[in-house]
A protein has these predicted regions:
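Pyridoxal 5′-phosphate
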Residues: 1-405
Length: 405
C-alpha cells in the first residue's frame, strides 16, 4: 500500500512554512524535493570518501570510483539499458540533448539534412538545432498538433524524406502533460532508417521507462526531476551510436593517448565525459533512483494519476477555468491553466502568498504558447508526495483569488 504519510516524512522541506502558511509544493515539473536518504548519502560521501574518480590508486579514490560506477549500474537497471557503456553522465537533460545535437551533426549530417521535432518541445530541444541551422545548414521540421495538444502522427509520417537523419521528440509535454506515443513514433522512424532521441525529462520521474522496449536510440533525463540532486543528468545511447559519434568536449578522462600530433579517445561512455564528473551527484542520483524504485514506479504512477484526475475534476468546476491539453484525462501529472482574465503571473504570485508554489510563464516552450495563442499559463505539477488535501487548497486558493478580479 502507498503510505503517503510515510512518504512525506522522507522529505523534511515539506514541513516548512511560507508566509506563515504550510508549504504546498506543486512545481515538481521544474524540480523535485529531495528525500533525506539522498541528502544523507551525499553528505556521507563528502565526509568520508571525497576523492577524484578514475584517477588515483589510493583507497579513497578507489572507493569514490566504485560508488560512481555503481551509480552508472543503478541507472542502467532503472531504464533497462543493455550495458553501462550506454550510460553517459551529463549535467542534465539540456546538456544531454546538446551533446547529441553537436556530436550527431558533426558525425552524421551535412548541409541540407533534416531533423524532425514536435510543436511541444522544450527550448532545449529546439534552440540547439537552430544553432546548427545557422552553423551547418541543418533543416528543422516540426510535427504539428491538434488544438487538444496531441501530435498528428499522419502528418509526422509525411515529414520524412531521404534527407531526414534524426527525430528528436519529448516523451511528455512539460506544459500540456500530453504523453506522446513515442514507441509508435520510434517504429515509424526506424521504418525510414532514422534514429530517435527521446527527451524523457518529464516521463522518467513519473512512470517506468524501458529503453529496450521503446527501442529508442537515445534518451535524456535529469536527476533533479527524479528526486535527485541538481547538476547531474543522463544520456542513454545505443552502443552502436555512441561508438560512432565524435566526442562532445575535450579534456581529461576522455582520452586514451595524447600527443601534439594526435589524440585518441576512450570508448563510451568515458569518451563523452571530459573532466572531473560530479561524482557526489551521481551517488545522490543513484540513491534517488533506489528510493523511487523502493516505492514502486507503478505505485507512484497510480498515486499521481489519482491526484491528476481529482485535480482536473475540481479545477473544471471553477468559473472561467481554461485547462490546456488533457483530452480524455489521459495526460501526465502536469496541468496548465488560465482563469478568466487573470494574468497568469498575478495568479501565481497570489497563490504564493497562500503558501502554494506553482510555475507561471511560458515554461521554456514559447513555440507551443504561440500555437495555443497565449503568452503563458499557471502550471501545477504533481509529485509522489503530493496529496488530495493540497489539491483542495489549490482549488480554494484559485476561487478566493478569482473573487478579487
Amino acid at each position: 500500500m502507498y503510505d503517503i504519510t510515510k512518504v512525506r516524512e522522507s522529505f523534511p522541506i515539506l514541513s516548512r512554512t511560507v508566509y506563515g502558511k504550510p508549504l504546498i509544493y506543486l512545481d515538481n515539473g521544474a524540480t523535485t524535493q529531495k528525500p533525506i536518504c539522498v541528502l544523507d548519502a551525499m553528505q556521507e560521501e563528502y565526509l568520508n570518501v571525497n576523492a577524484n574518480v578514475h584517477r588515483g590508486v589510493h583507497w579513497m579514490s578507489q572507493q569514490a570510483t566504485d560508488l560512481h560506477e555503481a551509480a552508472r549500474e543503478t541507472v542502467r537497471k532503472f531504464i533497462n539499458a543493455r550495458s553501462t557503456t550506454e550510460i553517459v553522465f551529463t549535467r542534465g537533460t539540456t546538456e544531454s540533448l546538446n551533446l547529441v545535437v553537436s556530436s550527431f551533426v558533426e558525425g552524421c549530417m551535412k548541409e541540407g539534412d533534416e531533423v524532425i521535432v514536435s510543436t511541444m518541445e522544450h527550448h532545449s530541444n529546439i534552440v540547439p538545432w537552430q544553432l546548427q541551422e545557422q552553423r551547418k545548414g541543418i533543416v528543422l521540421k516540426v510535427i504539428p498538433m491538434t488544438d487538444e495538444g496531441e501530435l498528428l502522427l499522419e502528418e509526422y509520417e509525411k515529414l520524412f524524406t531521404e534527407r531526414t537523419k534524426l527525430v528528436s521528440v519529448t516523451q511528455v509535454s512539460n506544459v500540456l502533460g500530453t504523453i506522446n506515443p513515442v514507441k509508435e513514433m520510434i517504429r515509424i522512424a526506424h521504418e525510414h532508417g532514422v534514429p530517435v532521441v527521446v527527451d524523457g525529462a518529464q516521463g522518467v520521474p513519473h512512470f517506468a521507462v524501458d529503453v529496450q522496449d521503446l527501442d529508442c536510440d537515445f534518451l535524456a533525463f535529469s536527476g533533479h526531476k527524479v528526486y535527485g540532486p541538481t547538476g547531474v543528468g543522463v544520456l542513454y545511447g545505443k552502443e552502436k551510436w555512441l561508438d560512432r559519434l565524435p566526442p562532445y568536449q575535450g579534456g581529461g578522462e576522455m582520452i586514451e593517448r595524447v600527443s601534439f600530433e594526435k589524440t585518441t579517445f576512450e570508448r563510451p561512455p568515458l569518451k563523452f565525459e571530459a573532466g572531473t564528473p560530479d561524482y557526489i551527484a551521481t551517488h545522490g542520483l543513484a540513491t534517488a533512483l533506489d528510493y523511487v524504485t523502493s516505492l514502486g514506479m507503478d505505485n507512484i504512477l497510480a498515486h499521481e494519476q489519482d491526484l491528476t484526475h481529482y485535480a482536473l475534476q475540481q479545477l473544471r468546476e471553477i468559473e472561467g477555468m481554461h485547462i490546456y491539453g488533457h483530452r480524455n484525462d489521459s495526460g501526465d501529472a502536469v496541468i496548465s491553466f488560465n482563469v478568466g482574465d487573470i494574468h497568469h503571473m498575478d495568479l501565481g504570485t497570489l497563490l504564493d502568498q497562500l503558501g502554494i508554489a506553482v510555475r507561471t510563464g511560458h515554461h521554456c516552450a514559447q513555440p507551443l504558447m504561440d500555437r495555443l495563442g497565449i503568452l503563458g499559463t499557471v502550471r501545477a505539477s504533481f509529485g509522489l508526495y503530493n496529496t488530495r488535501e493540497e489539491v483542495d487548497a489549490l482549488v480554494a486558493g484559485i476561487k478566493r483569488i478569482a473573487m478579487m478580479f
